[in-house]
Amino acid sequence: MTVGNPTKLIVLFAAPLILANFGQQLYMIADAVIVGKGVGVEALAAVGATDWSYWLALWVIQALAQGFAIPISHYFGVGDQVRLRQAVAMSVKLCLLIGIALTAVCLLIARPLLSLLQTPEDIFGGALEYLLTMYGGILIVMAYNMAASILRALGDGKTPLIAIAIAGVTNVILDLLFVLVFGWGILGAAVATVAAQLLAFFYCFWELRKLDLMKIGKDDWRFRRDIAAGQCRLGFPLALQHILIAVGGMI
């Protein structure tokens, strides 16, 4: 990233990032299309009614992961491998804690949120079932986004895009299997999406394990207030920005 035409390098790095983030939102579009074909119009409407509610959580996760990865890219750039490993370890711990808390909050507010958005009664049950299942997979989504953000911080924007492409194809296959063959309906579509995200995480994790920089030792897992504070200062404002955008979309 420091040698060559800056504009070309930025475009080549940013394009996979944009496509990968957009790809995560396509999961729900695939779910909606297959559910609409296999179950019916009401099921299609139920999935569609959850769009902004789920994107709110997804965008918060993406923002936090990207913010937490900024110090990692800094330490990578200056060649400080010790602090880099510590920042990676701290990112994992923060994502685990925030992921658990976010999952609990989202599961609690799912029903009130759909009510607040005036979801029609005839599709409310299906929308709630889909949203609860998707919210139940928040830790998996956060794990993928953190792994992908770490890879990007190390200059690898292609692996997360490949992971999303593989997961996207898997999501469609599982949608067809769970919805049309097994007859699981809306629940099947949500389970397919969560499973596809899990596959995307495993792919990124597998690639990370190949890197010598990722040989994190026991001492690296110690809590370091300065690193955690720096990551939170970067991640939370980004998350707040995405929350405001999502709330605007809901309104």
What feature does the model see in each segment?
Residues 95, 150-176, 187, 191-194:
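Alpha-helical transmembrane segments of multi-pass membrane transporters/permeases
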Residues 45-104, 141-160:
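Small-residue-rich hydrophobic transmembrane alpha-helices
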